[in-house]
Amino acid sequence: MIYGGKMKRNLIILFFNSFLFFNLLYSQESLNIPITPSDDQQLDNAVGFSRTLNSFNKSANSYAKLKAYINLLDSKGMKALKKHPSYSRLGDIYMYGAMYLEKEYKENKIIELYKKALELRAEPNSNYSLAIIYKNRYDIAVKKKDAVKEVEYGKMVYEYLNKYVILSRNKSAKYKKILNYFSSYK
């Protein structure tokens, strides 16, 4: 009986401690996991900035910072970016740049930003966005009866939508039907 009481007490203490630990862990406003520092302090700062992008406040200052970091990444070159230990976070800057600066930049610049994001990280939403952009271009080419552009854009729609379906594991019949239609362009 005494042994059973000690075990019961220990289980209660263990449960209480784990409850406190998980409560403390999940009550943090922003749980920041430290980045692995590199030789390039500017890129480390860019990684820190990328962690704030999911709560982008759309102020003029935020847009200016985003543009400045995109220019910084462009000046470093893709080879240097890929050497950084947190290079996928650098891809976030390109991805969010494409999303938030869509009204400011021309479509070709948005495409370039999404492609750079994909070069640094495999992410389904950028593939989907590119598929939509190329689908719109495809529709315009069909209306203008430009067969060369139709084939070019049809191929791109298939490529990016297929990557989206694979990465997102989306098994929707809608996407299968669209992929089947554009498969003739691959």
Where are these regions (language model features)?
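Classical Sec-dependent N-terminal signal peptides that target proteins to the secretory pathway
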Residues: 1-29
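Single-residue signature of alpha-solenoid repeat helices
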Residues: 59-65, 110, 150, 157
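TPR/TPR-like (Sel1-like) alpha-helical repeat modules
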Residues: 145-170
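N-terminal leader/linker segments that initiate helical-solenoid repeat arrays
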Residues: 27-71
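Short helix-capping/linker turns of helical repeat alpha-solenoids
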Residues: 82-83, 87, 121-123
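Alpha-solenoid helical repeat scaffolds
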Residues: 88, 92-95, 125-129, 176-177
